[in-house]
Regions:
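Conserved AdoMet/S-adenosylmethionine-binding subsite of the radical SAM
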Residues: 145-152, 157-321
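Short linear Ser/Thr-Pro motifs
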Residues: 76, 109-110, 191, 213
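Ferredoxin-type iron-sulfur electron-transfer modules in oxidoreductases and energy-metabolism complexes
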Residues: 135, 139-147
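Generic beta-strand structural signal
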Residues: 81, 93, 104-108, 116, ...
Length: 349
C-alpha cells in the first residue's frame, strides 16, 4: 500500500522553509513554492517549473499539493452554491458560495461537527468529530470554481473557529501575508460563540473582523440556547471587547437570530442597547432556518424591521441579513448531515 503524501497546501512560509531545508533545496525555493501554491494555485508539483527537475522529484517523494475537489454541490435559484467536501476520514464538511451584487462571499467550516451544541444549530446536533487542518480549511477556498471571484471570506460554517484556533490562525496568515494570497484582513470575518482564551488570542494575533454569536442579551436565556454561556458569559465577552479599539479598520459585529416568542420583543432590543453601550459595533439580525426536531420558529419581516429600527434609533447600527440558499438545505450542517445519514442508510427527517 502506497504511503499517503503530505499536503503542501495550508503550509505557512516557515513550514515550507523547513521542508526545503530538510530536502537540501536552496533557501529561495520556499518562496517559489508558496508562489506556485497561493498565487498561481497549481494542482501538481510538476507545474512548479522554476524548481529543478531534481528538486521537484525530491519534493514529490513525500509531498503533494493536496487540493481536492468537492464531492457534491447544490445550486440555489438565487445563485448560492453549497459545496460538500469529504475528509480523509470520510466525514463531510460544507462551504457555501454566496454571490451578492458586487461581492462574492465564501462561508467556510473549521471543524467536523461542533462541541458547542447550540440549540438552533444543525452542526451542533452532529456532535464533535474532528478539527480541520489548515490544509482542509484552505482547500475549501482553493478548490471551488469561483475562487477567483471571491471578495470576502467568513468563518461561519461548521464548527467553532476559536476551538481550532491554531489551524484557523495559520489559514489567516496564509490569506493575509504577502507570500500567500495577499488579502486585506478586512476581507475576512471570523465568527465565534466567544471562548475566552481564543477570543483574546484572536484579537491580539489577527486583524480580521470579529462576529460574536449573541442571539439573546439575557445570560440565563443564552445558557439555554448556547451552553457555552455557562463557561464564559456574554457580559464577560463584552468586558474583554471594551479593551479593544473597533473604531478603525477592524469591525465588530454581533449575530442575532430572531426566534418567534423567544427573543423577538423590543424588551430584548432595549437590553441589547444597554449591553453594547460604549462599543463601536453593529448587530446583524438573522432569520432562523428551521431544523429537524427543534421547537424554534423564525419571525415575520415586520418583526425584524421593528427590532432593527429600535436598535438603530437608539444608537446601535443594525442590519437584516438577507436569507440565501433556502432551497438547498440553507441551515448550516444540513447538507453534511443528510449526506452522512444517507451513507448510513438513514433519512433526515
Amino acid at each position: 500500500m502506497e504511503t499517503p503524501k503530505t499536503a503542501l497546501l495550508g503550509r505557512t512560509l516557515d513550514e515550507i522553509q523547513q521542508i526545503v531545508r530538510n530536502l537540501g533545496m536552496p533557501k529561495f525555493a520556499a518562496k517559489q513554492i508558496t508562489s506556485w501554491l497561493y498565487d498561481k494555485k497549481v494542482e501538481t508539483i510538476d507545474e512548479m517549473t522554476n524548481l529543478s527537475l531534481k528538486h521537484r522529484e525530491a519534493l514529490k517523494e513525500g509531498y503533494e499539493v493536496g487540493a481536492s475537489a468537492p464531492v457534491e454541490e447544490m445550486r440555489s435559484v438565487d445563485g448560492t452554491v453549497k459545496y460538500l467536501f469529504r475528509t480523509p476520514a470520510h466525514n463531510f464538511i460544507e462551504a457555501v458560495y454566496i454571490p451578492d451584487e458586487d461581492r462574492a462571499i465564501l462561508c467556510v467550516s473549521s471543524q467536523v461537527g461542533c462541541k458547542m451544541n447550540c440549540k438552533f444549530c444543525m452542526t451542533g446536533k452532529q456532535g464533535f468529530t474532528a478539527n480541520l487542518s489548515a490544509h482542509q480549511i484552505l482547500n475549501q477556498i482553493y478548490s471551488i470554481p469561483e475562487r477567483e471571484k471571491l471578495t470576502n471570506l467568513v468563518f461561519m460554517g461548521m464548527g467553532e473557529p476559536f476551538d481550532n484556533l491554531d489551524e484557523v490562525l495559520k489559514v489567516l496568515e496564509i490569506l493575509t501575508s504577502e507570500y500567500g494570497y495577499g488579502w486585506s484582513p478586512k476581507r475576512i470575518t471570523v465568527s465565534s460563540v466567544g471562548l475566552k482564551k481564543g477570543l483574546e488570542r484572536f484579537l491580539n494575533e489577527s486583524d480580521c473582523h470579529l462576529a460574536i454569536s449573541m442571539h439573546t442579551p439575557i445570560p440565563s436565556q443564552r445558557r439555554d440556547l448556547m451552553p457555552a454561556e455557562k463557561a464564559f458569559s456574554i457580559t464577560e465577552i463584552i468586558d474583554i471587547l471594551h479593551n479593544y479599539d473597533f473604531s478603525k479598520q477592524r469591525r465588530l459585529s454581533f449575530e442575532y437570530i430572531v426566534f418567534k416568542g423567544v427573543n423577538d420583543s423590543l424588551i430584548y432590543a432595549k437590553e441589547i442597547v444597554k449591553l453594547l453601550r460604549g462599543i463601536e459595533c453593529r448587530v446583524n439580525l438573522i432569520r432562523f432556518h428551521a431544523i429537524p426536531n427543534v421547537d424554534l420558529e423564525g419571525v415575520d419581516m415586520e418583526t425584524m424591521v421593528a427590532f432593527r429600527d429600535y436598535l438603530t434609533q437608539h444608537g446601535v447600527f443594525a442590519t437584516i441579513r438577507a436569507s440565501r440558499g433556502e432551497d438547498i438545505f440553507a441551515a448550516c450542517g444540513m447538507l453534511s448531515t443528510a449526506k452522512q445519514q444517507k451513507e448510513k442508510g438513514v433519512t433526515l427527517q
